[in-house]
Amino acid sequence: MKFKHKSVLLHETIDNLNPKDDGLYVDATFGGGGHARYLLSKLNRGTVIGFDQDEYAISMAKESFAEELKPGAEPKLILVHDNFCHLKENLVELGISDGIDGIYYDLGVSSPQFDQPERGFSYRFDARLDMRMDQSQELDAYTIVNTWSQKELSDILYKYGDEKFSRQIARKIVDRRREKPIVTTFDLVDVIKDAIPAYARRSGGHPAKKSFQAIRVAVNNELGVLQESLEEAIKLLKPGGRISVITFQSHEDKIVKKIFKKYSEVEIPRGMPMIPADSKPTLRLISRKPIMASSDELEENNRSHSAKLRVAEKL
């Protein structure tokens, strides 16, 4: 299977990095490599380091970017099979210690991951509950659904999925698993449908969409690793280097917005009448409001409707 994932906000994400001919850039979420391919076309002697924790994505990238991965290639691509929360240690291992010129994140889940039934991401295919981006980790969707407490389940469904029937769904999950384990995606879909009132199932898309999203976020600790990675990325940027982040969910965007605000504003310490002279912001926001997809892209790519791009520059 080949990646059919269509990159969202492609030009906006890369062009806002102000790519330098010989720059060093990090693609924190390589996926199908759409953003990386466009960035490589902008470089001459530069390097792109692509991170992905999904072994399948890395194996596909080795095929589709064979030329750029060859020793001595210019521009050069380096692939790293790891989570983007381990940026610094991997860069040090590669001998990079003087910073990077730019980094970007596309936080959408790649379409092929949903299209592989055995990955257990999708409510459209019947498969064992899994949802792990990194297939080597122990925690999976089956474990969460069958062992977490009713309160824990309710909390993640509400917090990560904005599911207003979170309590009803959590209660139904616990009741059902007392009878027998909830093993497959379709088992879980049936439980969710039973928990949601009939009137609510008739509108708003698939009734399991929000719950599946929430469980996926919990399985992969997506918000925790995002916050950790963004903090590290900002420290790794050289002065003038830029960071671009595409989000698709409100909880992701809130984290990006909060961290960008933290580093672009200087707080007056309590008890002091003014900002100390040596206190300076670390980032400059490229745009106060998030960059959204153009009308043309909205027509061509349905995924772009919820996409928000935020960009900042290291001072």
From Swiss-Prot:
Its EC number is 2.1.1.199. GO terms for cellular component: cytoplasm. It is found in: Cytoplasm. Signal peptide: none annotated. The keyword Signal does not apply. Transmembrane segments: none annotated. Keywords: Cytoplasm, Methyltransferase, rRNA processing, S-adenosyl-L-methionine, Transferase. It is an enzyme of class 2 (transferase). Residues 295-315 are annotated as: Disordered. Its main location: cytoplasm. It catalyses: cytidine(1402) in 16S rRNA + S-adenosyl-L-methionine = N(4)-methylcytidine(1402) in 16S rRNA + S-adenosyl-L-homocysteine + H(+). S-adenosyl-L-methionine binds at G33, G34, H35, D52, F84, D106, Q113. GO terms for molecular function: rRNA (cytosine-N4-)-methyltransferase activity. One of its GO terms (biological process) is rRNA base methylation. InterPro entries: RsmH, SAM-dep_MeTrfase_MraW_recog, SAM-dependent_MTases_sf. Belongs to the methyltransferase superfamily. RsmH family. NCBIfam families: 16S rRNA (cytosine(1402)-N(4))-methyltransferase RsmH. Specifically methylates the N4 position of cytidine in position 1402 (C1402) of 16S rRNA. This is Ribosomal RNA small subunit methyltransferase H. The lineage of its organism: Bacteria, Bacillati, Bacillota, Bacilli, Lactobacillales.
